[in-house]
Amino acid sequence: MGIQSSWFYSSKHQSAKREGMVKEGKGGIVSELIYSNNQYSDNQYSDNQAVINRILLPLLRQSGNEARWLLWVSPHKKLSRQWLINSGLPLDKIIQLNRMSSITTVEAMERALASGNYSVVLGWLPTLSGKDTVRLQAAAQKGNALGFIMRPQDVSKETSRAESRSDLLKIHSIHYH
């Protein structure tokens, strides 16, 4: 089927939620991934992208085995079919929405997370208000989904600030070591 251009999928395909695959309120989280903008190639995601390759791809591969979809909302680049294949991601479970304003993107992410139809929702958003963050978190919990707010960072401009910051990658966990 390939990469879908819309997350409104035909009614002949029942959602995982309606099939009882998702239990509302049992989980779900929204987190933020900041990655180096310098390692982002013009046509596809770079093989040198540590955050993408080491953290996100294994999670996406695992989630691709579920009955639910993987949604990419307003990425800066069109997903490369070849990159998806090389990354081991299921082409028939990837949906991509493009060219949305940040306000519409937040709303689309919220609706997708809450629907229960998506195991993972990735959105490229500017810094969110506290209200938007709470909305996305509640939606993720309702739909038992993982939401990632993707933020590119230009390393050449941020190197001096990055050395003094420890919050470049936010990983939320209930377990502390």
UniProtKB/Swiss-Prot annotation:
Pfam families documented for this protein: SulA
GO BP annotation list: division septum assembly; DNA repair; negative regulation of cell division; SOS response
Segments for region (FtsZ binding): 112-118
SUPFAM superfamilies referenced in this protein's UniProt entry, alphabetically: P-loop containing nucleoside triphosphate hydrolases
Cell cycle recorded as keyword: yes
Key words of the record: Cell cycle, Cell division, DNA damage, Septation, SOS response
Induction, as annotated: By DNA damage, as part of the SOS response.
Post-translational modification, as annotated: Is rapidly cleaved and degraded by the Lon protease once DNA damage is repaired.
Annotated positions for site Essential for degradation by Lon protease: H177
Assigned protein family: Belongs to the SulA family.
HAMAP family: SulA (MF_01179)
Function field: Component of the SOS system and an inhibitor of cell division. Accumulation of SulA causes rapid cessation of cell division and the appearance of long, non-septate filaments. In the presence of GTP, binds a polymerization-competent form of FtsZ in a 1:1 ratio, thus inhibiting FtsZ polymerization and therefore preventing it from participating in the assembly of the Z ring. This mechanism prevents the premature segregation of damaged DNA to daughter cells during cell division.
Official protein name in the record: Cell division inhibitor SulA
Gene field: sulA
